[in-house]
Amino acid sequence: LDDFTSLHMIVVTARCNFNCRYCHASSANEKEQDLDLDWSTAKCIVNKIFESPSPIIKIEFQGGEPLLNWPIIKDIVEYAEIVNRIAKRRLEFVICTNLTLVTKDILEYCKSHNIAISTSLDGDQEIQNFNRKPRGLIDGYKVFEEKLALTRSILGQDGASPLLTVSKTNLNSLPLVVDEYIKHDFHGIFIRALNPYGNAVDNVNTLGYSTEEFLKAYKNALNYIIQKNIEGYHFIEYYAALLLERILTPFSTGFVDLQSPCGNIISGVIYDYNGYVYASDEGRMLARRGDKRFCLGHVKDNTWNELFKGDIAKEVVKASCVECLPECATCAYQLYCGADPVRYYAENGTFEGHRPSSSFCQKTKGALDYIFYLLSLNDDRINKVFWSWINY
């Protein structure tokens, strides 16, 4: 705990040039005003970040679409680098972007400052354009392909890492989604379920599915991915890889959902464009809909101790130790799992949650059940694939 917090997410704007059907962040139209991070607040955020005792500082730029406020990203990067001349931390940067606003100049800047790119890919052209709708008339998928090629030409083949969101649109075609990733020469996928925040709640009738449906699709996709590996194409399912690392090694993964106490605050924290600080990205998502239960304070009004060691922080940590939670305390999978008080709060209004009705609990148990089943087969081919994921 003395070395927390390493991941610092900064919302540089709440505006976006896309209107994704499941947008967890409830992003606003790109033409709206007063939703951008200003320099005065940004400087306070950077100063607060470097008060963290962690030897590693990762600053992740989020939105909205962060490239709509590109000047402030540059200001933060350059100021953080100046501060780090004295702080001497291992400093890393990531931009989470839909890629459409990426230019050669932006990518050259990213290359010179070692800024990584994270993006989103939900499937083929039809699925991508349905789930992730540009606010204009452009073909989002086509632009994604063009900008991915540009990104790789400057930052290298691994210059952009995609993230998948599973909705009803692609739930039953996950093997085809995997093929789409392979088509674009990616070597891994994180099969991530919808979360109960933002637009995903509004559109749950058209995008949602049961936990049982997700697990059925997940198992099918995992089998497909394993077979692809056996056939010679190295491709990781990152969620399974995280669970396997917990099961087969003595090491922690650093994945906030599989920590006890949870990674909220301890591992990662988010600073909104207006200077308010939240225990997690999901806490910020709730605040966009008016519920600021997980607000730790403001960078201009509160000290580091008030933010990170205040009552809310202590309450979140206290409620996320699986060793003390009902049912978790006696669960066979306790060693491999974690707790998510923000998710529990969103689902039923309490930090501790209710395990029998928790989709988080059901999903994690179901995934672990299947991974242990695959391990029990003692199939040399499958085991070889699993170890290749852990040692990657």
Question: Where are the model-predicted features located?
Answer:
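Long, charge-rich, low-complexity alpha-helical segments
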Residues: 1-9, 179, 330
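Canonical Radical SAM [4Fe-4S] cluster-binding loop centered on the CxxxCxxC motif
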Residues: 3-39
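Cysteine-centered iron-sulfur cluster-binding motifs in ferredoxin-type domains/subunits
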Residues: 12-19, 65-68, 328-330, 334-335
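Conserved, mostly hydrophobic/aromatic
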Residues: 16, 20, 61, 275
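Detector for the c-type heme attachment site
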Residues: 23-29, 157, 332-336
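Radical SAM/AdoMet-radical enzyme domain recognition
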Residues: 42-62, 69-196, 200-210
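Radical SAM enzyme [4Fe-4S]-AdoMet core and its adjacent flexible, acidic
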Residues: 131-142, 149, 153-265, 270, ...
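Flexible mid-to-C-terminal extensions adjoining Fe-S/redox cofactors in radical SAM and related proteins
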Residues: 287-392
